[in-house]
UniProtKB/Swiss-Prot annotation:
Protein species of origin: Porphyromonas gingivalis (strain ATCC 33277 / DSM 20709 / CIP 103683 / JCM 12257 / NCTC 11834 / 2561)
A biological process term (GO) from this entry: leucyl-tRNA aminoacylation
Keyword Ligase part of the UniProt annotation: yes
Disulfides per UniProt: none
Positions of ATP binding: 703
Motif 'HIGH' region, residue range(s) on this chain: 40-51
Cell location: Cytoplasm
InterPro entries per UniProt: aa-tRNA-synth_I_CS, Leu-tRNA-ligase, Leu_tRNA-synth_edit, M/V/L/I-tRNA-synth_anticd-bd, Methionyl/Leucyl_tRNA_Synth, Rossmann-like_a/b/a_fold, tRNAsynth_Ia_anticodon-bd, Val/Leu/Ile-tRNA-synth_edit
Protein name from the UniProt record: Leucine--tRNA ligase
Enzyme Commission number(s) of this protein: 6.1.1.4
Catalytic activity: tRNA(Leu) + L-leucine + ATP = L-leucyl-tRNA(Leu) + AMP + diphosphate
Amino acid sequence: MEYNFQEIEKRVQGQWRKDKVYRVAEDTSKKPFYVLDMFPYPSGAGLHVGHPLGYIASDIFSRYKRLRGFNVLHPMGYDAFGLPAEQYAIQTGQHPEKTTEENTARYREQLDKIGFSYDWEREIRTCDPNYYKWTQWAFLKMFDSYYCNQAQQARPISELIEVFARQGNEGLNVACGEGVRFTAEEWTAMSEKEQQEILMNYRLAYLGDTMVNWCPALGTVLANDEVKDGVSERGGHPVEQKKMRQWCLRVSAYAERLLHDLETLDWTESLKETQRNWIGRSEGAEMEFRLAGKDCTFTIFTTRADTIFGVTFMVLAPESELVEEVTTEEQRAAVETYLTETKRRTERERISDKRVSGVFSGSYAINPLTGKEIPIWISDYVLAGYGTGAIMAVPAHDTRDFAFARHFDLPIVQVVVPEGETATDPATWEDAKDSKSGIMVNSDFLNGLSVEDAIAQTKEYIREKHLGCVKVNYRLRDAIFSRQRYWGEPFPIYYKEGMPHALDEDRLPLRLPEVDKFLPTESGEPPLGRATGWHTAEGYPYELSTMPGFAGSSAYYLRYMDPQNDTALVSRSANEYWRHVDLYIGGTEHATGHLIYSRFWNKFLFDLGIVCEAEPFRKLVNQGMIQGRSNFVYRIKNTNTFVSYGLREQYEVTPLHVDVNIVSNDQLDIDRFRAWRPEYASAEFILEDGKYICGWAIEKMSKSMFNVVNPDDIIARYGADTLRLYEMFLGPLEQSKPWDTNGIDGVHRFLKKFWALYYNADGIRVTDTAPTKEELKSLHKLIKKVGQDIESFSFNTSIPAFMICVNELTAAKTTSRAILCPLLTVLSPFAPHITEWLWQELGVEGSIVTATWPEYNEEYLVESCVRYPVSFNGKVRFNIELPADMSKKDVEQAALTAPEAARWLEGKSPKKVIVVPGRIVNVVV
């Protein structure tokens, strides 16, 4: 019987579904292990061969852990809300729910074909009301909570209200926005609306004025990763910075815990460092500067208060509320022009772009230590969300300040002389001087002190003179949590007299209403403004914004633990059994988004006692990217003529991506190209040697680059087991690598050779013959190697090990059941279909999924013979095989008396013979 992968995979997958072999439940007799993939957004394009890379790796690990006796939770679902579905709905008029349903069905079909061991009874979709009920519930809990810095946990807002009634808010150590001080009497005298406005400064979910990436064409706020080069990633529409009132989550309250608990996680150091930098803890001082000629002060945060004598100008972020205050009439037109320009740039662009720009406000500040006036400038290299949105510029010791001072011809004063140097004229410098260590100069009472001593003395001086306070600051911002879009979770909020009120929990889920269009209303309201009856039974209007894409993905891992629970996000018993995700696999692009928000969300639920562990993901593995091999055609400018790759330098050409499916070995199928797109129907070609040769490049696999390879095509030609093995064979999991089918035939031939160990023309060839010592050695060597590889995620090195073992067993004409049954178990995590089929054909009871991983025996791994390379004067001339326990003297004698040795000795006696036991023999003649 030949290896018929189509029949095998169809039957095996049907059997798995029928027997529900991947269904999992809490089983206290088994140790739990939770393996999770970052769930996909179901796009209309479906999966390409790059998507399953991490899924295959996690599936191998899950299957291995089951074989090791663990109770494995390995679920899958869909991150189904989001902008792409909404944009498609706007373009086609189709409801996002319909297209999302079609897309998820397509994804499910593709995932099933690859043979993943998912428990589909636990499937979740973020757009399902039964799921987003718990996203809304968590939001309400945050709305009704504040953060106590002293207790380092979230507490009910009702407790804070009681404190306000007793003592006001003086001296409270809690997380809050900018707020006024008030006594208990003043609190009691406030109206309900005034009290609610005060509480908004303390709630963990709050309404606040914040700078956002606003896209007028899309009518919505965009996250930083949805904007590129000043335009929306989807559609290429202009994006501007705009201050808007938005729902926010007070993620910054958890900054210290998010930072500290990184040390408890088994993540790569590079990923931890990315989060540390994003959280951005810095110790420094807040100092007050007075505006010259005005009874007004403003605060700056600095980590280097000791350099205050080197301050020669101040800089405000363009979004700072102080800009209006400090701008003089003479400078107003210039300032307004500059503000308009900066609105077009996102924060990321401002951080990465080194171009110098700015405008003088016309006003001056007073240096609190020197009393000197210093000019106040406005520049987009200062960000409103970090510190106070205002900085004191020390150009001698900060690269961006230095560039700014040089560009606008502002003074530069050196205040730190690096160790081993002498003070020099800054006019001769090419860049700022390092100030991390050295001796203070030009700094009044700090002169002669080391930097370390100067920092301590300056902080003490600031405290004594009441010029400010010592403070720890974080770069981490609160998360903007509302979007002016349709396809997202509705907020469980209604408005009464303009103030937000929480919907009662028993009225959840608040379902997304129907609308006639998915665009903003004519008056500029979000799409939900089009909904009929979008208000409470009492007539109070609901919130019109929806939640962002990360809302549904922030706690989805918990819902998988208990997906059918109608009364809780997750029961205490289910959470205490599964506890956390033991292995999480996904891309590095989520390091500063999803992974921060999920950790925050989990810590909040931990504070409430909903979950039993403070961290959601114990071990995190980032898979690399499978890149596409793109092809290009070269169109001569202003023509419809295409020139072959080797002749392109003779013309002025524009390279264009072409569908890789109409290219073979870089040769274009001209007829298929003309049929590919209407504009190419009349295309002309300049060929080389009668062929049109395309250019190529290794790029991200993307529909827009026409380099997508559909896994369905690979499965149809080679089978799912070949695809699974080949994706692992391409290279280390964590590295990016190009997709190249040159090696896939070899992997497919391996499976045929593996099949031939079990089947021949007459049928099953497996017997009860006792295994030989060499067969046992081959098997146990493989068991050890593959087990170690899986534990270390070195899946790529397992594939050659399988090939070597099968070659050895084929050469030995192995038929022994004692060898071939365990071999099936070891290969089954990688190639589950062929191994399941053969397992059943051999009459073994149950599914191979529930088999037991074989233990290797060290006795079989001891080498009885050693192959020695024999060198003469350093060059290997021949090899000899000798017993492993042979003495050095006997090895030397065997090498010198071997028939091949005479040729290289030439009748001479060796000057020296070096024997490295078990390794090499070197003869010096």
